[in-house]
From Swiss-Prot:
Entry's localization field: Cell membrane
PANTHER family from the UniProt entry: ENDOLYTIC MUREIN TRANSGLYCOSYLASE
A Pfam family this chain is assigned to: YceG
Family: Belongs to the transglycosylase MltG family.
Name of the molecule in the record: Endolytic murein transglycosylase
Annotated catalysed reactions: a peptidoglycan chain = a peptidoglycan chain with N-acetyl-1,6-anhydromuramyl-[peptide] at the reducing end + a peptidoglycan chain with N-acetylglucosamine at the non-reducing end
Enzyme class label: lyase
Organism: Bacillus subtilis (strain 168)
Coiled coil: none
Topology of the protein relative to the lipid bilayer: Single-pass membrane protein
Keyword Nucleotide-binding: no
Length: 360
């Protein structure tokens, strides 16, 4: 009887061990199949084209987010891990025609090979003003710069944009003191067009649509910070125009916000140049007397609207300024920016880093 009990106990243990092994294999197998499924197309036989824009300088995580948002991949994490596993690199910025029937290998191959072909493309650079963008459009299309500016300033067309992009184009653009209603609203990117006869309206809408996509992305943060799209674009444009390649935009943003809180004029030179309507290598003291609502030496607060477009780094800085006590900054000849807290410190920095011939 004791022997039978031992045998029974042995077989029970064996059964438990075997069951555990089976369960373990099922778990491992299930995990493997699930992981494998994440690498497969979203819709295996789909031919649906999805137009994707990869901004310049996008990280793998940012690319994954864009692909997932457009329902081209199943999982951001799976895409990131697979890219790392494959050792893939050299993703190129631009517009791509992808489809939901592509697996991760096909998508990666596409993004590393370069953007899809097009009939023409228009490149809008960061910090470009509306008149410069109009010239860029004119260079690549049948429309003259004058025609482009007229369309960009056309109230009827802008009202159409308001209806199509109500979260982005608002009544703020109709401020009577604004030079160009859509200044700052044409997002910096490269825009390829497949149809050589693309209408001027559609070209402009493509740029507004791109801005609108980022407005949607940052909507909750703007609401949290109690800042409108117009104010965000305005602040971002000031940061963009002041920043050098080596500048800490978040610190520049902190200077502007600190001065606004103290009701000090922003005193930023690019606004004077915008008011004058021309670019100069340096701003003279007489330029500071220009009578314009855009002159931040004569007026407190923000300018009536943006003075240029701005890239994402300036958007980020406008939304997330550093917490500092800085009220002044200046750029050294090598592009580095010196931040100071008092006028006395600022003047010392000017004496140290800026030669007399380059001063106002």
């Amino acid at each position: 009887m004791y022997i039978n009990q031992q045998k029974k106990s042995f077989f029970n243990k064996k059964r438990i061990i075997l069951s555990s092994i089976v369960v373990l294999f099922l778990i491992i197998g299930g995990a493997f199949l699930y992981g494998k499924s994440l690498l497969e197309p979203v819709e295996k036989d789909s031919k649906t084209t999805v137009n994707i824009n990869i901004p310049s300088g996008s990280s793998v995580s940012a690319i994954a987010s864009i692909l997932k948002k457009n329902d081209v991949i199943k999982s951001e994490k799976a895409f990131q891990y697979y890219v790392k596993y494959k050792g893939a690199s050299g993703f190129q910025a631009g517009f791509y025609h992808l489809n939901k029937g592509m697996d991760l290998d096909a998508i990666i191959q596409k993004l590393t090979s370069g953007a899809t072909g097009y009939a023409f493309q228009i490149t809008v650079t960061e910090g470009a003003q509306l008149t410069q963008i109009a010239a860029a459009i004119a260079d690549e299309t049948k429309y003259s710069k004058k025609q482009v500016i007229a369309k960009l300033d056309d109230e009827t067309f802008i009202n159409q944009l308001k209806k199509e992009f109500p979260d982005t184009v608002t009544n703020d653009v109709f401020n009577k003191n604004i030079k160009h209603p859509l200044e700052g609203y044409l997002f910096p990117a490269t825009y390829p067009f497949n149809d050589p006869d693309t209408s001027l309206e559609d070209i402009i809408k493509a740029m507004i649509k791109q801005t609108n996509s980022y407005v949607e992305t940052y909507k909750s943060e703007m609401k949290k910070n109690k800042v409108s799209v117009h104010k965000l674009l305005t602040m971002a444009s000031l940061i963009e125009e002041e920043a050098t390649e080596k500048a800490d935009r978040h610190k520049i943003a902190s200077v502007f916000y600190n001065r606004l809180k103290k009701k000090m004029p922003l005193q930023t030179d690019p606004t004077v140049l915008y008011a004058a309507g021309k670019h100069k290598d340096r701003v003279l003291y007489k330029d500071l007397e220009i009578d314009s609502p855009y002159n931040t030496y004569k007026n407190t607060g923000l300018t009536p609207g943006p003075i240029a477009n701005a890239g994402m780094s300036s958007w980020e800085a406008a939304l997330h300024p550093d917490k500092t006590d800085y009220l002044y900054f200046l750029a050294k000849s090598n592009g580095e920016v010196v931040f100071t807290k008092t006028l006395k410190e600022h003047n010392k920095a000017k004496e140290k880093y800026i030669s007399s011939k380059n001063e106002k």
